[in-house]
Amino acid sequence: MNTSQETLERLAAELRKAEGKGEPVGPLRDVIGATNVEHAYAIQRLNQAYAIANGRRLVGRKIGLTNPKVQAQLGVDQPDFGCLFADMAYGDNEVIPFERVLQPKIEAEIALILERDLPSASTTFADVIAATGWVVPALEVVGSRIEGWNIKFADTVADNASSGCFVLGGPARRIDGLDLRGATMRMSKNGEVVSSGSGGECLGNPLNAAVWLARTMAEFGEPLKAGDIILTGALGPMVGVSAGDHFEAEIEGLGRVGVSFSVDVTEVLK
């Protein structure tokens, strides 16, 4: 599908407007095509450039669609990536305003914090291990600027891989001795377990996902740098979020991470 630069810029602006107004838009695939990866990433990069030009600080990347259960939920069959900005980060057990993310859902992940650059498009598993400074449990709050989560691959890629915000837990651990592949995850919502899985559900190993990201970012000309945060992907199914919810995830060998969402004041006043 032949799409002009002007059209890509218009679609990027529509996504920004959707987030700013809290009003989702229709699927972008109707314009760019459901599988047009090039145009989808072009839209994402336009909004990345806009964000940076307006003072937002890029602090890492998220990998999406690494878990077969999540892929099945969204009807896609390959990973993608999106940007993490400093203003998307929340502290462990902090309260996130419910309106912060459009149509929010949440998933538990393993996060890596790099201490070395990963500049090569032929990055190996060993390279990622050597470059990783810290490993922490994380929660990612995903959201969609596309109405009703009616998305295909091109929609979520253009929409910054459906990123919303994220929470890092602790304690921060060194990677040596950790079994990230075998680590089990249990996530509870208001005290009830609602999602479970393991590191093996994230492209077979969360480090495989990080290798994929390092190679992909090098190919894009934006290689991963020391200090970058990598959200390696969901360890189990994502779960819907309602105002007032509290979530807690425990990842075997890593620790715990929690977050709460504010009560919807408009509902309380009704």
UniProtKB/Swiss-Prot annotation:
Catalysed reactions, as listed in the record: (S)-4-hydroxy-2-oxopentanoate = (2Z)-2-hydroxypenta-2,4-dienoate + H2O
Gene Ontology molecular functions: 2-oxopent-4-enoate hydratase activity; manganese ion binding
Entries under InterPro entries matching the protein: Fumarylacetoacetase-like_C, Fumarylacetoacetase_C_sf, Hydratase-Decarb/MhpD_sf, Keto_pentenoate-hydratase
EC number: 4.2.1.80
One of the GO biological process terms: 3-phenylpropionate catabolic process
The protein's required cofactors: a divalent metal cation
Pfam family of the protein (one): FAA_hydrolase
Keywords attached to this entry: Aromatic hydrocarbons catabolism, Lyase, Plasmid
Superkingdom of origin organism: Bacteria
Pathway per the UniProt entry: Aromatic compound metabolism; 3-phenylpropanoate degradation
Entry GO terms, CC: cytoplasm
HAMAP family in the record: MhpD (MF_01655)
Family of the protein in this entry: Belongs to the hydratase/decarboxylase family. MhpD subfamily.
PANTHER family found in the cross-reference section: 2-KETO-4-PENTENOATE HYDRATASE, ACID HYDRATASE
NCBIfam families named in the record: PRK11342.1
Function according to Swiss-Prot or TrEMBL: Catalyzes the conversion of 2-hydroxypentadienoic acid (enolic form of 2-oxopent-4-enoate) to 4-hydroxy-2-ketopentanoic acid.
Record protein name field: 2-keto-4-pentenoate hydratase 2
